[in-house]
Amino acid sequence: MALQMMKLVIEATVNTTVDPANTRFFHVTTTETAAGATLTIDAADFFQDDGTAVTTLPTLETDNSYYNVYVNGVLQMDGVSTYTPGATGVGSLDIDVPAGGDPILANSPVVLEVVNYTPSSTTTVAT
């Protein structure tokens, strides 16, 4: 008999699901924030989609999340803001208004969007 390669016969199927959880938080500024200053918004100063008060800003899942900040409906650049998850007095959003730019005016809407992904995979192996 001639030499032949002996190998395993295996079939595998992997199903991966990624479920996003998108949460939006809203705030309307009460005073002007000058260029070069920082606007700090505490968790309790935000309200949710249904108008209820926020008590806690969610944790960003490591490598499976991001947040966006909109001021007056305009998406802001990365690096302008700092997000800190947590309850009232701990959780906050800091927006550093660039020096030499325009201020954030009073009554400006600020929207914080937090997206966390929950991935899951199942593998079926048949031999």
Regions inferred by a protein language model and the residue ranges of each:
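Extended beta-strand solenoid/passenger and fiber regions
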Residues: A2-V71, L75, V114-A126
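A short acidic/small-residue loop/turn micro-motif
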Residues: M77-P85
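Surface-exposed interaction regions enriched in Ser/Thr/Asp/Glu
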Residues: L3, T84-T127
